[in-house]
Each structure stands twice: as C-alpha cells, then as structure tokens.
Amino acid sequence: MPRLPSLFLALFLIVPVQAQTLAERLGFLAADKLLIINGDDVGMCHTGNQAAIASLERGLMTSATLMVPCPWFPEIVAYAKANPVRDFGIHLVQTSEWKTYRWGPVAPWDQVPGLLDPEGYFWSETPQVYAKGTPQEALIEARAQIRKALAAGLDITHLDSHMGVLQYLPAYLDVYRQLAVEFDLPVRMASQAAFEAGGQPSWRARFAADGILFPDDFVHDLKYEGPASVKSLWMRRLTDLKPGITEIYIHAGQPTEELKAITGSWAVRSAEFETFTNDPDLRALLERQGVKRIGYRPIRDLQRSLRNSRAKP
C-alpha cells in the first residue's frame, strides 16, 4: 500500500498530454464539473461596469470581457489594474447595436471603411458586417482593440466576439484563430455539436492544432421569456452539467436610468445580475452538484506554457 501513490504518480506522468482532458491538465479530475461564468459587454456603460464588479467580488461571475471601443472602457481598465487577480478578456467588437448609444472603430477609419455605417459608427447587425466589411478589416480592428487594451496595462486573459461576428463564417473564424495565435490567448468556442450542425466540424481541431485552448462546452441557447424567466431557465440549464469545462455568459446590469436609456433589455440584464450575484438558490445548486467555478487565467497560463514548450527545439 505505501507504494501505491508513487505508482499512481508514475502512471500519471507517462500519460501523453494529448490524452488528458483540459480539466486534468489544469490539475482537476476528468470527472470534475468546472464552470466559467463570463460577463459580456463590460465597458459598454457605467452601470454594466458596476454590476460586473459586484458580481465578480461577491457573486458567481468568474471572468469578464471588455468592449474596448466603448466610452466606459477606461473605468473598467482602472479597476482591472487595481485588482490583478480578476480575469478580464477582450470582447472583440465590430458592431454597435443600440439605436441612440453608438460607438465606432479603434483603428483609423480609412483602414476599416467597410465596418462603418453612413454615420461613421459600426453597423448594427452581424450580417451587415459580412455584407459590407471584409475579414481583413475585422482583423485590423480587432488587433487595434487588443493592442489598445495592452497599452492601457490590461493583463488580457482571453478573447471572445461581440454578437459572434468572428465566430460564424469561416473567413472570420480564421481571423479569430489568427488573433488567438498572435496574442497567445485562449478563446470562447462553440461546442463541437454546434459546429457540426453548422457544417463546419473541423474548427475546434484547427484551433487545437495551433495550441489554442478553449472550454469543452459553451452554453448560449437560452431563450428568455422576459426577466421573470431568467432564474428558472438557468436553474434548469445548470442542473447536471457535463464533466469538463463549460462556459456560460451573462450581461449583468442594474435598473438605472442610464441602462434604461440605452437598451430595452435592461430588465433582463438586471435579472441576470440578481440571479448570479444576490440570489442564493443558483449558488446552492452549483454547490450541491460539486461544480467548481474557474476563470480563464489558468487556461491562458497553461496554453502559454504548453506552446512555449512546443516551440523550444
């Protein structure tokens, strides 16, 4: 019996890295259920920033992604720099969806003319970006956003895409892949089942071949029936999570006049904030199931370690 732990360790060490799950490579068990709860649209407005900070500090949120072109980006960067243990990624932006609250590119306008509507803002909808813009313009703009965040002192932990612009069409997915490789960052990724349903089964393997890491599953298919449905839908959806790493996202908000003036979704965003920050029931559900909440930082650090090792002769 005394020799069993040593034998187990030896067997563990000879298992090829490729045969291990991402959870195992992070030091967890293959059967563990790990959950990333990401706050999207942070930096969009002051209310969103304050809601995200509250949820990160005393709620269930484990990471957030920032909208660099938006007016309240400097505020959340200042918080991130003062709180380096928090995980902040970039919510890459090529659209500006609200009617009276708009934003445009970080890159020079003459480098991304196809991303601009007649008023000089980003287009409102993803299909408009595909119809008017080009993947090269999307790459230029996304790169400018990442570089601006780095120049501001943000320790970026991951990437995702606002309104999915970089996550649907193959040419834009390749832009997403290029950025992940260039800046050595993990990414939000659709599930294998979703890619297969869309007729694009090879993308997860292509990112993995470049050493890019991403969660095992991504939940993005909830359809709310108003703010009253938010809690019950998440309680059902987060029951019996699969082993491995699952990512979900929310848009945390509070019922301020600012948010009400920006979007008609303010009540749903407020309900998401309450469910994931102040309501004890969802927290208790996750605890009963043994779900472990994690952020993107350990995934990023593992990715960089593995890619650095692979690059050495």
Language model region names:
Residues 5-16:
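Bacterial N-terminal signal peptides
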Residues 17-36:
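N-terminal pre-catalytic segment of deacetylase/amide-hydrolase enzymes
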Residues 34-36, 61-65, 85-91, 156-160, ...:
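Structural preference for beta-strand elements that scaffold enzyme active sites
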Residues 47-71:
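A short alpha/beta connector and helix-capping loop motif
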Residues 103-129, 264-267:
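Active-site gating loops and adjacent loop-to-helix segments of metal-dependent hydrolytic enzymes
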Residues 135-212, 224-229, 239:
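Catalytic domains of cell-wall/extracellular-matrix polysaccharide-remodeling enzymes
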Residues 187-190, 262-313:
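C-terminal domain-boundary segment and adjacent tail
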